[in-house]
Swiss-Prot record:
It catalyses: 5-[(5-phospho-1-deoxy-D-ribulos-1-ylimino)methylamino]-1-(5-phospho-beta-D-ribosyl)imidazole-4-carboxamide + L-glutamine = D-erythro-1-(imidazol-4-yl)glycerol 3-phosphate + 5-amino-1-(5-phospho-beta-D-ribosyl)imidazole-4-carboxamide + L-glutamate + H(+); L-glutamine + H2O = L-glutamate + NH4(+). It is found in: Cytoplasm. Its main location: cytoplasm. GO terms for cellular component: cytoplasm. IGPS catalyzes the conversion of PRFAR and glutamine to IGP, AICAR and glutamate. The HisH subunit catalyzes the hydrolysis of glutamine to glutamate and ammonia as part of the synthesis of IGP and AICAR. The resulting ammonia molecule is channeled to the active site of HisF. Keywords: Amino-acid biosynthesis, Cytoplasm, Glutamine amidotransferase, Histidine biosynthesis, Hydrolase, Lyase. Pathway: Amino-acid biosynthesis; L-histidine biosynthesis; L-histidine from 5-phospho-alpha-D-ribose 1-diphosphate: step 5/9. Coiled coil: none annotated. This is Imidazole glycerol phosphate synthase subunit HisH. Heterodimer of HisH and HisF. It holds the Pfam family GATase. Its EC number is 4.3.2.10, 3.5.1.2. PANTHER family: IMIDAZOLE GLYCEROL PHOSPHATE SYNTHASE SUBUNIT HISH.
Amino acid sequence: MKRIVIIDYGLGNLRSVQKGLEHAGASPAISGNPEEILAADGIILPGVGAFIDAMKCLVPLKKTIAEFAESGKPMLGICLGQQVLMSSSEEGRLTDGLDLIQGRVLRFPKSELKVPQMGWNNIRVKQDHPLFKGIPDGSFVYFVHSYYVDTAAENTLASCEYGLEYAASVVNSKGNVMGTQFHPEKSGATGLKILRNFVEMC
């Protein structure tokens, strides 16, 4: 069985992601050990909270995560885990991210829409990629976030409309580093299919 490691860096609802992967047919481990991370067939970077706190917690693992990404093996960031894959964030103060995918994390502009975006919204699939195999355009997934990813079209796997169009899912140029702003582990059958697709990529 493929070895998938959920990275434990002090932030994130690890158990819900673990349960989601188990429902997708995997037996994931939770670890913050660099050797275990590098030995994995695939890794998941979860995250709930503030960008600046996440980057502080990730300092001991930055080199490990960069090395894993360079290896070409699949990596998936979820929610805040997608945001930290980017170059920078304006949350709190301008803070550098892991810079595995070029782009910025920005606050939703003031509008009549409530921030954070919390609940179900539909996504538009923008690229033919294994992560979205069998996912119909317009599928609904579950979001909870106040900041969004602004990145180039070639890095956008799926988009979402919430006052503006933003990257609901991202990918690097190699195709192995991916992120979802939504929570696949909370997105019903659609999210389960996305997690299964990730497991199949590993």
